[in-house]
From Swiss-Prot:
Molecular functions per Gene Ontology: 4-hydroxy-tetrahydrodipicolinate synthase activity
Record SUPFAM superfamilies: Aldolase (SSF51569)
Record-annotated active site: 132 (proton donor/acceptor), 161 (schiff-base intermediate with substrate)
Site features described as Part of a proton relay during catalysis, chain residue numbers: 43, 106
Top-rank EC class of the record's enzyme: lyase
Native species: Thermotoga neapolitana (strain ATCC 49049 / DSM 4359 / NBRC 107923 / NS-E)
A Pfam family it matches: DHDPS
Pathway where this protein functions: Amino-acid biosynthesis; L-lysine biosynthesis via DAP pathway; (S)-tetrahydrodipicolinate from L-aspartate: step 3/4
Subcellular location: Cytoplasm
GO annotation terms (biological process): diaminopimelate biosynthetic process; lysine biosynthetic process via diaminopimelate
EC number: 4.3.3.7
Protein known as: 4-hydroxy-tetrahydrodipicolinate synthase
Sequence similarity: Belongs to the DapA family.
Name of encoding gene: dapA
């Protein structure tokens, strides 16, 4: 579907409403920075607090701005299989290139339940599906063996966003899924694990950091894929302070503060999320300056 960097893009708000003017600026910044895909309405896009009408407007606006240059992937995960399918169908109708489906959260399905969830949805859409494994938020972990079973059996499930963070699991997930199906893709769901996942044979990252540093994150992957491993490692090391700073509070609180400092969006979130503390804002100012982004 894509190799390299897919930006998990924020959803800008202003006075409680979608700020589509700011959103267009941010999308064009991503395109200029060379990212390979946009992921709309994921965790970073505050999907749980965006209503169905807003979802439609945001996805439509994204497709309009991108105009086929890169894939547009829409977050469509819930903890109800039927509700998830409804969001998938909305994305399909709007013309999205694919959907990112987080594992059902709170109700904690078994590995068999996870498999059946993705099987049910994949049989009812022609869209490309990406599994999103983020056990720190969902309470459920897609084991490498389950990911490999999905890869083997469900042909329109094209890859997994692996945000487990465990290096051993990353390695096993890459190894088992690609043994099951050579074109199955694995993206890091943690910016600070991107280089390690690439070394394990993965395909890139679905990134928060690329909201503020699209070119740098794109360069990291491009250098690696070109065989310039040491150059990629150097970029990774330079990005480490930014990677760390953007997660000192719950995502997307710091990244919205950073984008506000850079002049792209208002520093506005929807409850239950609140803006970054003054301490975090000061930290971000320093890191952004050191990174040449402010």
């Amino acid at each position: 579907m894509f190799r390299g960097v897919g930006t998990a893009i924020v959803t800008p708000f202003k006075n409680g409403e979608l700020d589509l003017e700011a959103y267009e600026r941010l999308v064009r910044y991503q395109l200029d920075g060379g990212v390979s895909a946009l992921i709309v309405l994921g965790t970073t896009g505050e999907a749980p607090t965006v209503n169905d009408d807003e979802r439609e407007r945001l996805v439509s606006k994204t497709l309009e701005i991108v105009d086929g240059k890169i894939p547009v992937i829409v977050g469509a995960g819930t903890n109800s299989t039927e509700k998830t399918l409804k969001l998938v169908k909305q994305a399909e109708k709007l013309g999205a290139d694919g959907v990112l489906i987080v594992t059902p959260y709170y109700n904690k399905p078994t590995q068999e339940g996870l498999y059946q969830h993705y099987k049910y949805i994949s049989e009812r859409t022609d869209l490309k599906i990406i599994v999103y494994n983020v056990p720190g938020r969902t309470g459920v972990n897609v084991l490498p063996e389950t990911a490999a079973r999905i890869a083997s059996d469900l042909k329109n499930v094209v890859g997994i966003k692996e945000a487990n963070g465990d290096i051993d699991q990353i390695d096993r997930t890459v190894t088992l899924t690609k043994s099951a199906r050579s074109d199955f893709m694995v993206w890091s769901g943690n910016d600070d694990r991107t280089f390690y996942l690439l070394c394990a044979g993965g395909d890139g990252v679905i990134s928060v950091v690329s909201n503020v540093a699209p070119k740098q994150m794109s360069d990291l992957c491009a250098e690696f894929f070109s065989g310039n491993i040491e150059k990629a490692r150097e970029i990774h090391r330079k990005l480490r302070p930014l990677m760390k700073a953007l997660f000192v509070e719950t995502n997307p609180i710091p990244v919205k503060a950073a984008l506000s400092l850079m002049g792209y969006v208002e520093n506005e979130l929807r409850l239950p999320l609140v803006p970054a503390s003054e301490k975090t804002v000061e930290l971000l100012k320093g890191v952004l300056r050191e990174s040449g982004l402010l």
